[in-house]
Amino acid sequence: MKRAADYIEMKSPAKPEYVGIIRLTLSGIASKMGYSYDDIEDLKIAVSEACTNAVQHAYKADKTGEVSVRFGVFEDRLEIIVADQGDSFDIHDKQKGLGPYSPEHTVDQLSEGGLGLYLMETLMDEVRVQIDSGVTVSMTKFLNRERVDDGTTVQNYETN
């Protein structure tokens, strides 16, 4: 099993003003890896959506929490995990209430809310959502759109 060349983790308070810091960190990592400008913008939008969902929905107004973001830097891809320990939701119920998305519809015809998941799935090569004690969104963007799947992911990477 290949290990990530670099593994970066950051935690921030679940507040909107810290999402920009996560975006800046991501931009630096992706630029260092050689992603194109367009791919970096896609990465930033997807990660911002995941972080914003955690900030807006994970913690009730009277409850404070944090957002954890992990970056797994591989030779051929960047894997990002955004996690919170807040209130969970049923993703399948959420998707049923929103879809189906159709290319014939313009953005203003889509129902409000839930566009974050749609954007993440559109902009990233892989997206997985795990709901347990909180919500964990795992996203992968392959460098140069090449994909060689050997099963190594940030989720099964063990830190020493």
UniProtKB/Swiss-Prot annotation:
Negative regulator of sigma-B activity. Phosphorylates and inactivates its specific antagonist protein, RsbV. Upon phosphorylation of RsbV, RsbW is released and binds to sigma-B, thereby blocking its ability to form an RNA polymerase holoenzyme (E-sigma-B). It holds the Pfam family HATPase_c_2. GO terms for molecular function: ATP binding; protein serine kinase activity; protein serine/threonine kinase activity; sigma factor antagonist activity. The lineage of its organism: Bacteria, Bacillati, Bacillota, Bacilli, Bacillales. Keywords: ATP-binding, Kinase, Nucleotide-binding, Serine/threonine-protein kinase, Transferase. This is Serine-protein kinase RsbW. It comes from Bacillus licheniformis. Transmembrane segments: none annotated. Its EC number is 2.7.11.1. It comes from the Bacteria. PANTHER family: ANTI-SIGMA-F FACTOR RSBW-RELATED, SERINE-PROTEIN KINASE RSBW. It catalyses: L-seryl-[protein] + ATP = O-phospho-L-seryl-[protein] + ADP + H(+); L-threonyl-[protein] + ATP = O-phospho-L-threonyl-[protein] + ADP + H(+). Belongs to the anti-sigma-factor family.
